[in-house]
Structure formats: structure tokens, C-alpha cells
Amino acid sequence: MKLVYRFPTLLNYVNVLKEDMFSRYILNSLLVSVIVVAGNLIFSTMVGYAFARRRFWGKKILFSLILSTMMIPTQVTIIPVFMLMKQFGWIDTYLALTIPMLVTPFNIFLLKQYVEQLP
């Protein structure tokens, strides 16, 4: 096995593009990505705006609670989220891929900081 082959070829790329389901894989990835990005943009902007500009009871505590969820490793939440998706009957659906990622604490924090900097 060599690190750099003498005669490089694009044959593997051609084989992948000829595969029947490859376009479906790309479409699935695109669909999930667009839904998650749009959901994050909409919901995180609303939550970030509320934390930045509105006054309500428990604002600091709630924001600290949201930020503290960023300290929980993703590996710890994978099995409980899977069990929840199984209870909902969402296994092998787009909902199971998109709903858990629609709002993320990092995006809430990022958009809160952005809205606070607006005049």
C-alpha cells in the first residue's frame, strides 16, 4: 500500500456517482441540514432576543440552566434521546433527526450576545 499512487484515478468517484441510491443520500443530507439550520435560525433568534431585550422573572437562572446543558457531553444524551424517539415512534424518520437539533444552547448564547450588541 502506497501513500501516493503513481497513476491517480477518479474511478472510485465515478462508481459512487453511478450508484442508484447516492442521489437519495445527498437529498436526505440536504433536507435534514436545511431543516435544522432554518429551525435553529428561527427558534434560537427568538430565544436569544428574549434573553437579550426582555425582562422577566428568573431570566438569569434560566439562561444559566440553558448554558449548563452545554457541559453535558453528547455521548451521555444519545441513548436517552434514542429511547425517547422510540417511544414517539419516530425511528427511521426525519423527525428523529431534526427535532432534537432544532434549538441548541450554543446558538441561543451566540444570538443573545449578537442581539445585545445591536444599538
Regions found by a protein language model. Give the residues of each.
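A structural signal for multi-pass alpha-helical bundles of membrane permease subunits
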Residues: 1-119
